[in-house]
Amino acid sequence: MKKLLLYLFLITAGLISTVQVSAQKEIAPGVIKLQKGEIDTFTPYSLFGGKPVIEAMKALPAAKLPFDAKDVQIKITDRGCLIEVPLEDNEQIYGFGLQFETFGQRGLRKRPIVNDNPLNGLGYTHAPQTFYVSTKGYGILVNTARYTTFLCGSNQKTEHSRQQRIEERKHIATTTEDLYKNRSNGNKIFIDVPGAKGIEVFVITGP
């Protein structure tokens, strides 16, 4: 019995450790760094990042996140890292670098990858960035050089009714954008970073 209880305790502790962010630090006014696991040696910030201009940033008006930074979850598995960021119903998402086919990214799947001849709206572009901004006044930067996929609120809420799903499926997709767009409002952005043993996420607030 004692062995069983010990086993259950270890399993539970392991599951919790895959979700909780191991480090949270404000590295500049309005910039919070979330970190978990073993960070890659080469990342955009480690290679090109300069020092924040602290005094100039202090002069900017303070902004409040629409969620607690602790609500951002980072899970590390054998496959890589999965990041979950809360998303409100009336929130729109923009970014991921120079995008040709789409502007508002809510409800879409984006994979920012360098491509000199992008033929679709999935994220391939001349100047991709693992960064997006929200109409709620904040930005999310995933500090990684790995191929990263963003599911921008395309998940189904658990309370989403069966009838609503049936109605939405009546719409026939005729473009790539429509194919990956979800008519319902998901409540999270899922960020998938395969192969990563750890990750840094910068949460940036602004006026």
Task: Map each language-model feature to its residues.
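Catalytic and substrate-binding clefts that recognize carbohydrates or anionic sugar/phosphate headgroups
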Residues: Q24-P207
